[in-house]
Structures are given as C-alpha cells and as structure tokens.
Amino acid sequence: MRIGKSSGWLNESVSLEYEHVSPPTRPRDTRRRPRAAGDGGLAHLHRRLAVGYAEDTPRTEARSPAPRRPLPVAPASAPPAPSLVPEPPMPVSLPAVSSPRFSAGSSAAITDPFPSLPPTPVLYAMARELEALSDATWQPAVPLPAEPPTDARRGNTVFDEASASSPVIASACPQAFASPPRAPRSARARRARTGGDAWPAPTFLSRPSSSRIGRDVFGKLVALGYSREQIRKLKQESLSEIAKYHTTLTGQGFTHADICRISRRRQSLRVVARNYPELAAALPELTRAHIVDIARQRSGDLALQALLPVATALTAAPLRLSASQIATVAQYGERPAIQALYRLRRKLTRAPLHLTPQQVVAIASNTGGKRALEAVCVQLPVLRAAPYRLSTEQVVAIASNKGGKQALEAVKAHLLDLLGAPYVLDTEQVVAIASHNGGKQALEAVKADLLDLRGAPYALSTEQVVAIASHNGGKQALEAVKADLLELRGAPYALSTEQVVAIASHNGGKQALEAVKAHLLDLRGVPYALSTEQVVAIASHNGGKQALEAVKAQLLDLRGAPYALSTAQVVAIASNGGGKQALEGIGEQLLKLRTAPYGLSTEQVVAIASHDGGKQALEAVGAQLVALRAAPYALSTEQVVAIASNKGGKQALEAVKAQLLELRGAPYALSTAQVVAIASHDGGNQALEAVGTQLVALRAAPYALSTEQVVAIASHDGGKQALEAVGAQLVALRAAPYALNTEQVVAIASSHGGKQALEAVRALFPDLRAAPYALSTAQLVAIASNPGGKQALEAVRALFRELRAAPYALSTEQVVAIASNHGGKQALEAVRALFRGLRAAPYGLSTAQVVAIASSNGGKQALEAVWALLPVLRATPYDLNTAQIVAIASHDGGKPALEAVWAKLPVLRGAPYALSTAQVVAIACISGQQALEAIEAHMPTLRQASHSLSPERVAAIACIGGRSAVEAVRQGLPVKAIRRIRREKAPVAGPPPASLGPTPQELVAVLHFFRAHQQPRQAFVDALAAFQATRPALLRLLSSVGVTEIEALGGTIPDATERWQRLLGRLGFRPATGAAAPSPDSLQGFAQSLERTLGSPGMAGQSACSPHRKRPAETAIAPRSIRRSPNNAGQPSEPWPDQLAWLQRRKRTARSHIRADSAASVPANLHLGTRAQFTPDRLRAEPGPIMQAHTSPASVSFGSHVAFEPGLPDPGTPTSADLASFEAEPFGVGPLDFHLDWLLQILET
C-alpha cells in the first residue's frame, strides 16, 4: 500500500498523519510505489494498530519494559555490522497478516520477542521506521519489539500490510516490491560500533513527540493570524488542513472565523478551497456565509460537491430557487435532498402536485428531506382526496420536519380514527400534532393517552393535550405530564393544571417539568425568593430546564454588585428561548456595554437580552454599536437598541449595516426611520431583504402601492411573508368576487400573521358573505386585520350560528366585535364556554358586559379572570361593585389589571399610600397593572419631603403616563429646567396655569369617564354634557394628556404608555427604546441640551413666530393606538362632579345648546373605521362620511367630508402627520401652551 496517495479518504488520512511529523522524522521515501497485494480497505486500520494506535489508551511519560529473555550475542570475532544495506532476498511469499503481537493491547509482544530470528540491521531500521510512524499518529507509545514475528507453520517472517508499505521493509523484499529500496533518514544519531559490540538491545517505541509537534502547528497557526482561543477550539485532526488551505481560502475572501467553522468538517476545507470559484460562478448570489453554513455540517463537503453540477438547473424553471433557498436545502437536507430535489423538480411542480418552490424547499430542508419529498409525491394526492381532505398546506406542514415521511404515513393511518369518537379531534389539531419532529410518535401517544388524560384524576381538556403534544418531543412530554401532574398539583408544589400544561407545551417539555420538580422549592425559598409564577415563566420556553438551572446558579451574582439587576430583570432575561445563554451573555457584556464608548443603560441591555437569541444580540450590539452610530449610518443608540430587541436581533443588526445605505439611495429612497421600523421586529433581517427585492415591483403596476404601504406591511413579525403574500394575492383580491380595495388588503397584511390572514380571506370570503353569516366586506376585513386574523375568521365560521342562537343570542355585530381583536378566536371560544355561567348567579352580568370584557385584546383571559375574581372583589375587604370590575376588565390587559387590584387594593388604601378605592380603580382602568405596581414601589418616596407629592397628584401622574410617568418623576424629570427655559425664551402673557387647568382629581375623572363609557362614539358628546364643557375646552384638556383631536372625537383614549411617549415628544425628549422610563442621567442630559439649544440667539423669536412649524415625522407609519372596544363597561360607581371649576368658567348657559352643538360637530354616523359597525346597537353596515366639524383653533386640521374606508386603521388612530403636528413645536406659544404649562406643574416635584 502506498503512502501519500491523494485519492480516497484512506490514503488522505495517511498523508495527513505525516503532516504532523517535523522534517527530521519525516520518511525520505514518498515516491509512488505499486499497490501491494491484498491492500484493501482494512489496511488503514491494520497500519494504525501495527504502530501502536489505540483510541482510548492514556498517554504516559514512560513505560517500563517487562522482563524478557536475553537475545543471542554475536561472537567477539564477528566483523563490524555494516550500514543499512540490502540483505539477501527474503522469501517472496510474505502473508499480509496483522499479528496480535503488534496490537496495542498484546503483552506477548513484550514477553516473547520472537527468539527464533536473530536481529539484523534491517529489523532495527524497521523499528525506527515504525517509531516514526507512531510519532506521526499523536498516540500513546506502545512497546514494540525490534524483531518481526515468525509464522510457525511456514517458518517465514511475518509482515503485515503496514510493514510492507514501509520503504525499509520493502528493501528487504525486492521481489515483492517494484521500487528499489531506499534507506530512511534516521531520527537519532548512532554511535560507531566496534567489532566486539553485540547487537543493541531490542528497541521500544518511546512517547510520541506530540508536544514538539503541537508547538510547531500552534506556532504556524498563530503566525497565520489565528487567536489562541480559536486554535484551542479546533479539532486536532483539522490543524494541518487549516494550515494547508489557509492561503487559498483567505485569498477567496474567507475570514479566520469562517475557516475555523468550516474545519468542523475538515474534508470541507479542501472542497471549498478547490471548488469555490465554480460555486461562485454557478450561484453568484451564494454568499460566503451560505458556503460556511453548508460546509460545517456533518457531510457538508458531500453537499457542496452534489450542489455544484445541479445548481444552474435548480435556479432555472420550474423551481427558480434563489441562492439562499438552495443553501438552506444543502445545509439541512444535505446531499440526498439536493439530488432528490433535482431529480423530482418537474414532478413536484406539475399536476397533480402543483407545489410552490417555497413548499418544495420547506420539505427538503430537513434531515430525511429526500424521503419526505418522495413521500409527498406518493401521499399528497391521496391525502387531499376523500376521506382525508387535507389541504396542500397541511400536507406540506406535516412533511416539513425531521421524520416527515413517517409523519405522513402516521396521519394517513390515524387521522380518521382521531376525528371520530371517542377522540373527536378536528383536522387542524391532528395536523398540529404531526407537524413537528417526531410527529408520528406524538400522534401515537395522543391516540394512546388522550382518553386517560381527559378523565379523572387528570381532567385535561382536549386542547391542553393537543398543546402538549404539538412540539418536538411531544410524546415524551405527554408521558411526563401523565406521570407528574398529580404530584405537581399537590403540596408542596401547588401548581395549577394550566401552569403544568404551560411548562410542558414547549420543545423539551419533559425535561422542563423535571427541572421544575427539582428546583421549584429551592427557588421559592431564601435566598432566591422567586414566586411560583416567575419559576413557571422561566420554565415555559424552549430550553426551560437549562434556564432554571442558570437562574439558580447566577441569580445571586447578578443581583449583587457590579451588575445590580433586579429579580424581575433576571427573570425577564431567562424567560425566553435560550434563556441560559442570555444570562451568560449578560454576565459577559453588561459591564462593558454600560461604559464608554457604548453608554447603554441597564434597562437597554436587559431589553436586548430579553428575547430569543438574546446572547447573540448582545454580542452584536457590542460589535456594531459604535460603527452604526457613526457616519455613514448615523443611527441613534435608541434605534440600534430597538433593532436588537427582537428575536433575531443579531441578524437584523447585520442586515441594517449591510443594506441601510442601499435602501436610503435610489430607487428605494427609504428614510432611516423606515428602515429601522422594518428591522425592529422578529425576522427583521428577512423583512429588509424582502423590501429590497420587492419594493420597486410593488410600487409599479399592477400593484401601485405607496412606499408607506410597503413599509407598513413589512413592519411586523413575518413581514417578509406578508410582502410575498401581497404580491401574490393583491390583484386577485381587488377583482370579483372579493372587490377589496388596496387599503383593505394592506390593512389585513399589516399585522402579525398577515400572510395567513390574506390567504384566509381569499378562502373564506365567499362563504362568510353568504347566508347564514351575511357578513359585510368591512366586517370581514375588520376580523382579519388583527394578529391571528386567520384563526379568528375560522372561529367565526365555526361558532357564528351557535352564538347567534339561544342561550347566547348575540347579534352579528357583537360576534364580530369579539372576534376583531388580538386572540379573537380564543375570545369567541371563551364566550361560548363561560357565557351562561357569567349571566347566572352569583355573577349576574348582562350580555353587554360579557361582550365588553371579551371585546379587547386578551378577551379570553379577561373573562377567565372575571370568572375567578368577581365574587372575591365584591366581598370584604375590596367592596367593589360589578360595574367597577367590568370597567377594569374591559380593556387590553384586563386580566393582569384585575389581578393587580385584587393583590394591591388593601395595601394602597392604607398608609403611606392613602389612595381611595375610586382612585385605585381609575388607575387600573386607565393605566393598568404596571401603573399600580409603580405606585406601590415609588409612592412612599414621592410622598417624602424631597418630592412632596399628594396622593391626588400621584394618581393623576399615573393616569397621564402610567408606569413610565411615575418612574420618570421618581428619577427626576427636569421639569424646573424646562419651565425656566420656557419662561426665558417664550414668555406668554396671561394668567398662571393653575387658574386655567383642572385639578388632578378632575383630570382623573375625565379620563375615567372616557375609558369606562359604554359607547365610545357617544363618549365625547356625553362628556360635554356631563362636565358642562365647551368643545374646544374639552379637546384642549385631552390634548394636554396626549390625546389627539381625532381620538377624542371618536372616544378612543390610547393607553398610558403611548400618550406618555407623545407628551415627551412635545417636550422634545424621546426616552430610550426598551427602557421603562428615562434614566436620571439621560433626563439631566436632556435638560442641559435644551438649555444649550434654546440659549442660542434668535430662538425665542423663532418659537414665537412659528408656533405651528412641523418637524419631520420619525417614521412613515404612525404607532397604532390601542383600539377601544365598542362595548365597554358601565358607568363608574363613584359620583362624578356635576361641573369642573376650570370648565365652569367656559360652560354654555343651556345644556340643550351643548347637545345641539355637539350633535352638529360629532354626527351620529361618526364611525371608528373597522370598529364602527360593531357597536351592539345603532350601527350601520357601512360607514358614512364625517360631516364638517366646527371651525376652531383646535379643530382646523379636522377637515370636512373626509370619508374613511371600511377595513382601514381606526380614524381614532392618528396619522404620522397628525402626530408630527401634535408634537410640532415643543416650546411654541400656540393655543395649547397653557395646558402644557399645567402638565409641567403637575409633574413638577
């Protein structure tokens, strides 16, 4: 067998062994020699065993030779031994046998060193040759005798194949080897022998010189620019390959990090070095990152080799795959999937399969992709037909996972059984279970365990069982729930069934349950002091087990110096996929990112880390923040943080850096704010790529979208898929029978899950427009224009007739109102489940109240909270009435708000808070749970002498801006500096603000009135009458707390956080993204910046002369207000003041006059866009135009005869132009200045 031959993995391994041998020990003879007889695939193993290769043999410094018999001694008169010269020919018939005596574990090689053969110079040369080979293997030394074994049967000396391949042994057998013998270069000096010398004692192989060889390779890699950390992580067998191909790969543009990643599959180094030019020519869009991701896989070299001849065909018809799609298949499906994709490409895209390229790629991009593609070809026609009736999308979802072929077969075998009694699953549930890795086993587990888990003592619902099984490892999770549920529900754990299900309903659910069982008691005790809810939140994600263990190990350190994180912050970081790694990233990066040149706040760092992939996002911010803040990018710190604070934040930052300059130039002409808005969502990287490839096409015929519309579609989770869906569906949806306008299509697509919502509208539109549903186009668009719109439409189709009939008797508008929110499907199901119970004793709610609670984001959870807490809150010590409870629950976040009132009301009514029940209810209704928590945390400090705020002012601040406002005041909002600058630079003659503005109590009353009103359309008119106010005065009051005119007229009060952001914008300050409130340093820096800016000459005149000067909007897409449900709870229980002192000075003399005036300015047909037609009474199917409003300083921008199309964002949602005007001149002297001064007076401490 030849050494150094380059064909085949076997001989490459031999040559790689020589790469580790330094020149003094490298054998001289490397010429090609003919292959010896019997040199087969096992010769490599024989050779390694012959030289002492043993996988698990420990390295030792020295070996003590065992006792052995003495060798014959040559007579003294014998002539001196000659140098290495060929001996007389040995017998030709040398069997190639690997004797056990040469194996690493044989002791016979030591104790019986073949005394039948006298030692010869050839044998000693053989020993030195074998010793050199042993050095090259980097393996522990094994004693080897200097004499070969003897075949007792033939009397011949035995040589194995490894010995036969040696040039020394070959020299002893010239008949057996064609090449002439060559003496090797000796690795050690030999002393001159005298005539009386005997042959030296038998030689044992010494320990390989691995330290010397390691130093040589290490030094070479260091010289090539690799860091010590990179070298430490490399595999030993890859070192020489890296050194060999480094120059070639770096010349092709690969970095040191790229080469290290490729070396995980060392064979890929050679393939990439040799074939990169051909790959780049065949796939010009294939990036080096794609190649690295493919090459580092288990068989990446084979995938690259398979890709090269078929790449051009895959980019052509019928698939027309992009380079990234081909790379995805090669990375995950490897060579078999690439070959199957090429072979089946026409069959998959033609009749009867008609798969799209995206579907084909999804199927092929998994382990077992080849088998899945073949199975789809066979099974898809069958599963689409009766009796299965699966859609193509469902079949693709099942096949697009590891084990997709087996999952398809399992669905075919079990679907009909699971749809029937006693299981009664629906098709979607079966598909959900099967659409994960291990789907076959999960289906079998559901079939085996569902009936047991639905019965006593488990009492799980079908939905809960399906949720547990619908993840990777679903079978094991079901088994764990069955084994541990009863124990976890009992003492000392005391978990609820819902909490156990939440923990188990993720990848690795079984391990997460075991971790909760092991660590819950410790984490609830000292010194951790976590609540049960916090432990459950940490465990309820992929990798929950590891996250719990990391919290237990690091919580105490992170709460102490120098990190100083709160327990809530640590929990927030850990409560995501990859929470363990995110905590490690915080420990490594927090101190660095808080110092120069980064200057991030702790809250910003926590916000970045509190997402899936948080560790990588932190590292990316550390690497790129400084560059992105500098020219030519010129991003602000807040924008960088906003981009990084999402799933895939690292990739989004890299995409912004790569594409920002291009997207700001022609032909895209996007603003920096628009690019940031697109990137600041989950999947921002893909969304930016989609905008770059589709913007120009979508702006042209036949789509004719505006740039703002394209940005609006892309600025959500799944923006890439939504853009693709608009490109595919827009033309069809604008035509008959759908007849949607472009704005309606954009509204549907501009939500999370927009792609699926568009597809659902196209599929369900004809059915829902016809009897018995008879929904209008506007109602369908309203349902679909929310996250989860597809599921909401399907739920309406499934539950509509039941909810319209007794005992529910809901109107069509009420059903649509419930479905037209986040989680509309779940809200409809909750109404069906809880309606009769809530209408009966002891609850006694009206139908309108049940609908009002369900008609908000999170309606299901709010209904469940009312079911659990209403009896408790009506009893002592709470003593709330039903109307107050319904008012709190009838808003987004109703469940946590109710729970916060239940937990904190007794505390907040006592010292040192001294709040009334009405104030607590108002804060919970207006600003929610977080505001109550902020008051509990900060009010004792705000009541002290350093702030001296009364309870009424604290309550007003909480209603104005929620938690953010309370924390900003607590940290030191620079109100005095702002007011002083305003007095110096923009003096206004007139009465002081205290004589013009309402009291804090009156402000809270007005906001609560709007939030608790049953008919938002009528709220403004009723407020004019209730508070005896003029229209301009009420508008100015609402404007002073961040409500735009159009929102006020529609009765839509945005949530406190959004209003606070607007108010800070009017003051000229934008808090850092991701932070709960501005930090003291940033606030003081803001005040100093204001003083420097306004201290310049001419600023006062500029302010006075241009009170309405607009500044550019921050983004083309205004933040959408939280849309109010049309069915809100009843009036507040506390008596409202008949009139307010500040309004009394401006009130009309006759209440009827007020009614007439308001009727003219706010007509009965004022609609809130998609929400208008959902009011239970007095609603039309189609909205009409808004009549001309009174002309007044506060309403001039509210033009006449403005028609709002159905299915668009609410007219209660201000446009970017509205917000720009609202925040136009922070320090002007316009009509709102008095009320801005009044706001500053309330905030001043």
Swiss-Prot record:
Location of the motif Nuclear localization signal 1: 185-191
Positions occupied by motif Nuclear localization signal 3: 1108-1111
Protein's UniProt keywords contain Ubl conjugation: no
Disruption phenotype: No alteration in pathogenicity on tomato (S.lycopersicum cv Supermarmande), another study found decreased pathogenicity on eggplant (S.melongena cv. Zebrina, PubMed:20687809).
Ranges spanned by the short sequence motif Nuclear localization signal 2, renumbered to the chain: 980-983
Entry-linked InterPro entries: TAL_effector_rpt
Spans of repeat Core repeat: 355-389, 390-424, 425-459, 460-494, 495-529, 530-564, 565-599, 600-634, 635-669, 670-704, 705-739, 740-774, 775-809, 810-844, 845-879, 880-914
Keywords, comma-separated and alphabetical: DNA-binding, Host nucleus, Repeat, Secreted, Transcription, Transcription regulation
Induction cue: Regulated by hrpB, which controls the type III secretion system.
Biotech utility: By combining the DNA-binding domain with the catalytic domain of the restriction endonuclease FokI, TALE-nuclease (TALEN) enzymes able to target specific dsDNA sequences are created that enable eukaryotic genome modification. Other potential uses as transcriptional repressors, for transposon targeting, DNA methylation or histone tail modifictions are also possible.
GO MF, one example: DNA binding
Region spans: Activation domain: 1237-1245
Signal peptide annotation: none
Motif (Nuclear localization signal 4): 1145-1148
Composition-biased stretches (Pro residues): 67-87
Protein name: TAL effector protein Brg11
Species classification: Bacteria, Pseudomonadati, Pseudomonadota, Betaproteobacteria, Burkholderiales
Gene symbol of the encoding locus: brg11
